[in-house]
Amino acid sequence: MDYKKIIKDNYTLHLIKTDRFKTINIGLKLTKEYNKEEFAYLNLLARVLPINGTKNYKTVNDITKKLESLYNTGIYFKSLQTSKNMSFEASLRIVNPKYTEKSMYKESISMLKEIITNPLIKNNEFNYFDVTKNNLINNIKNIKDNFFKI
């Protein structure tokens, strides 16, 4: 296993090279000081991006079909909070290109980039923003309602 840490002005890149696995995980983590209101938006962003569609893949079905054509590549988003920081994570799980076509690696990274940088936006909003916001509010209410029943 080879480990390399590259520190730049605005980011730190961690590279771990190993040939023990048949899948490759690539992650992007953006971290900043915790802010309650911004964290709510980060949480919504992590929930909206995978289902929203993009300029080139208009529906979640289009995204799913493309990911399946890339040997069921997985793309995941989440928001995390610690006492002082909050972060947004995007990760990609792909089959090691040595077992597939060489172009698959580049196509998978392009798909992650497409979802992050080209979301489908109409009237200055994500397609599923209101639905996702209401689902999140209901989840929070359910946690509060069920907390005392445990």
Question: What feature does the model see in each segment?
Answer:
Residues M1-N25:
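N- or domain-start disorder-to-order transition segments that initiate the globular core
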Residues L45:
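Active-site His/Glu-centered metal-binding helix of metallohydrolases
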Residues V60, T64, I115-K141:
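Acidic/histidine-enriched alpha-helical segments
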Residues K55, Y99-T100, N124, I143:
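A general boundary/transition motif marking the beginning of the first structured unit of a protein
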Residues P50-Y57:
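Catalytic Zn2+-binding segment of zinc metalloproteases
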Residues Y3, I143-K144:
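A generic local secondary-structure boundary/capping motif
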